[in-house]
């Protein structure tokens, strides 16, 4: 990163001008091949990407030589029906150009984020990227709030909106024209972006570029919260600043306050409530407030109008659900979360008079939703729709130990992700399904019965499904009648993406 930063300072690229000459540099394609910039700060799913064996220095040199030709892009456009300028299967060189372009547009924003973290003296921010770090924030804040809103971030209705979003940050016109050309080659210029089909297609073709565009789009949608935070006249905690850095995409837009202040001068009084908290993961976000239901409805009304009028985004009102925290459980990041009232009776006696007081304490609860999780296991062929374990087909050349290790790894990953559950009974049922499915798979392989196979295997199968959390809890907490191990919650700081089986959306 330091070498890259020095190169940009020497050639004047720090001012976001003339990014397109970087397409002629070999190290850009090396970064694209290795998913550079330290694993890409932007990406939430980059660990799942695979390397392409065709990315060699010889291919890159040939690609740069072709791009030096003045009529290369013109010929590619005129012959797009035969070659397919952007299609990965039809033109490998064009796919490499789009991947290199994705790295280039990330560079200024990555440097801006690193400098922002250095100014705030945030030495270690990787722990804050963990998904589990959101739930302690919920636990600390939501117990004092009244209402919660489930919000789905709207999708842009036209491709040009994505290009216009980057114009505020990148003044390099050729780079923006190249981005526009890539987008219109994927879809027709008159087509609309559909939430599922087009995004899944684009993410498979060039996931890095898609994530960059999507994050920049979401950041624009969330910019209203930065503005409203600055408009609040109440004191704010210092921890909120670091939380804002990892929630939003990159930094802050300096002129945003002036622009929005001129556009919405009469509605600022609606947002003076300091007890408003916002959390997002991917396209779903949670907005919680201590205000009245009237205030929350005003939030909904102005968010919808702000997105539609200022960013030309179509947001249906039913994409924002308003509920009271005491009567509603919201689904977020694979957990079913709610605020429960736990009543307790306190008896006190003063001289001859005795008093009894009933108190209710709000407590944040997180549980594992058993029905959606069983549906995910049924889709993965571990059980049927009713949760009955079945044998999973595996390759015949796999040994028994390899099959047991695979089942055990799946069970440990699920237990690791759902370690913050308040009630572990649902998780114990999932472990039972995976363990019995493993036994059925092995008994089917050996053409034996499950009972006979479990009797022969003994405790070896059980030890493979014993998670590290259970071993640690048995050492930290002694087994006493008052101790309830199924109520212990553990949040980890190494989880940067949602578990596939836990993602039911």
Swiss-Prot record:
Single GO MF descriptor: RNA binding
Pfam families: Intron_maturas2, MatK_N
Sorted UniProt keywords: Chloroplast, mRNA processing, Plastid, RNA-binding, tRNA processing
GO terms classed as biological process: mRNA processing; RNA splicing; tRNA processing
InterPro entries according to UniProt: Domain_X, Maturase_MatK, Maturase_MatK_N
GO cellular component, one term: chloroplast
Localization terms from the record: Plastid, Chloroplast
Chain coiled-coil ranges: none
Main localisation: plastid
Keyword tRNA processing set for record: yes
Disulfide-bond pairs as recorded: none
Record family assignment: Belongs to the intron maturase 2 family. MatK subfamily.
Role noted for this protein: Usually encoded in the trnK tRNA gene intron. Probably assists in splicing its own and other chloroplast group II introns.
Stated name of the protein: Maturase K
Organism: Calycanthus floridus (Eastern sweetshrub)
Lineage: Eukaryota, Viridiplantae, Streptophyta, Embryophyta, Tracheophyta
């Amino acid at each position: 990163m330091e070498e890259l930063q020095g190169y940009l300072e020497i050639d004047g690229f720090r001012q976001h001008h003339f990014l397109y000459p970087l397409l002629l540099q070999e190290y850009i394609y090396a970064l694209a091949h290795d998913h550079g910039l330290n694993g890409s700060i932007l990406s939430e799913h980059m660990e799942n990407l695979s390397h392409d064996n065709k990315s060699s220095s010889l291919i890159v040199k040939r690609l740069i030589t072709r791009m030096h030709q003045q009529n290369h892009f013109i010929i590619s456009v005129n012959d797009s029906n035969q070659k397919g300028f952007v299609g990965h299967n039809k033109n490998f060189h064009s796919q490499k150009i789009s991947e290199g372009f994705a790295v280039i547009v990330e560079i200024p924003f990555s440097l801006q984020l690193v400098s922002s973290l250095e100014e705030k003296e945030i030495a270690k921010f990787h722990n804050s990227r963990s998904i589990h770090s959101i739930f302690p924030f919920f636990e600390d804040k939501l117990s004092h709030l009244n209402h919660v809103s489930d919000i789905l971030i709207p999708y842009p209705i036209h491709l040009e909106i994505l290009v216009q979003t980057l114009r505020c940050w990148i003044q390099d016109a050729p780079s923006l024209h190249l981005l526009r050309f890539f987008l219109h080659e994927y879809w027709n210029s008159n087509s609309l972006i559909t939430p599922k089909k087009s995004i899944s297609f684009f993410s498979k073709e060039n996931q890095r570029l898609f994530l960059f565009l999507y994050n920049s789009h979401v950041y624009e949608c969330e910019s209203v919260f930065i503005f409203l935070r600055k408009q609040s006249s109440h004191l704010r905690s210092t921890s909120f600043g670091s939380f804002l850095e990892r929630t939003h995409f990159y930094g802050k837009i300096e002129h945003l306050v002036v622009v929005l202040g001129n556009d919405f001068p009469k509605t600022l009084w609606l947002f003076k409530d300091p007890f408003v908290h916002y959390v997002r993961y991917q396209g779903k976000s949670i907005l919680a407030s201590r205000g009245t239901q009237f205030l929350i409805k005003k939030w909904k009304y102005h968010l919808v109008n702000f997105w539609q009028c200022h960013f030309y985004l179509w947001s249906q009102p039913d994409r924002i659900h308003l509920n009271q925290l005491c009567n509603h459980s919201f689904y977020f990041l694979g957990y079913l979360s709610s605020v429960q009232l736990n009543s307790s009776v306190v008896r006190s006696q003063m001289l001859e008079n005795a008093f009894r007081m009933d108190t209710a304490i709000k407590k944040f609860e997180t549980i594992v939703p058993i029905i959606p999780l069983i549906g995910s296991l049924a889709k993965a062929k571990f059980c049927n729709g009713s949760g009955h374990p079945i044998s999973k087909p595996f390759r015949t050349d796999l040994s028994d130990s390899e099959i047991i290790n695979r089942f055990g790894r799946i069970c440990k990953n699920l237990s690791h992700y759902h370690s913050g559950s308040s009630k572990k009974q649902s998780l114990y049922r999932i472990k039972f399904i995976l363990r019995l499915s493993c036994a059925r798979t092995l008994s089917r392989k050996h053409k034996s019965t499950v009972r006979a196979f479990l009797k022969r295997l003994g405790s070896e199968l059980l030890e493979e499904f014993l998670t590290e959390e259970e071993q640690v809890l048995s050492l930290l907490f002694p087994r006493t009648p008052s101790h309830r191990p199924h109520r212990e919650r553990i949040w980890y700081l190494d989880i940067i993406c949602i578990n596939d089986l836990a993602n039911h959306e």
